[in-house]
Amino acid sequence: MEYNEKDFKISANRKTQKVWIILCVILTMSYASDTANGLYPKTAYVAFLLFCWIPIIIGRIILRLQGYATPIYKDVIAIGYGIFYAYIVFTTDSQLAFIYILPVTSMLILYKNRGFIVRCGIFNTIIVVAGAVYHYNAGINSSADFKNYQLQFSCLLYTSDAADDL
């Protein structure tokens, strides 16, 4: 079987698009449930929807205009989901919010581009650290939360380090 770079890019973009949409559907339903139960105001849910779905729409437009083999789509995922992830990290009190990045990080391995994965890992780590500083300055953290931040940081480093195996 012969390697075809165009077919590889098409396959990677289609797979990541499917995973990204599924992840956003799950998060949208979860956030809707939390909003209905009074955990978030409706305005926060509207902002969530915008941060969640506008990057997907932009990605779909780019795929339609440039074709599924476009190398730009991976950057749309990284930037679009990165902004959405930052919104979640900064607006939720849950220490588990950092896991929302793990499915996307594992998706990026499909592109088999070590430098790209490392750059995304650095960006994700900056978001987690900035979120921890933000929550600390807002008085939201307890001393036990710092252990959680250490775990988050370690998970992100490990995920980024997996790029060395490419």
Regions found by a protein language model. Give the residues of each.
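Hydrophobic transmembrane alpha-helices and their membrane-interface boundaries in multi-pass
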Residues: 15-93, 100-106, 120, 124-129
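Transmembrane helix interruption/hinge and helix-loop junction motifs
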Residues: 90-95, 112-114
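Interfacial aromatic-anchored transmembrane helix boundaries in multi-pass membrane proteins
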Residues: 86-93, 128-154
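Short, Lys/Arg-rich cytosolic juxtamembrane segment immediately N-terminal
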Residues: 8-16
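Conserved small/polar residues in nucleotide/adenosyl-binding loops
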Residues: 158-164
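Short, Lys/Arg-rich, polar N-terminal cytosolic tail immediately upstream
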Residues: 1-9
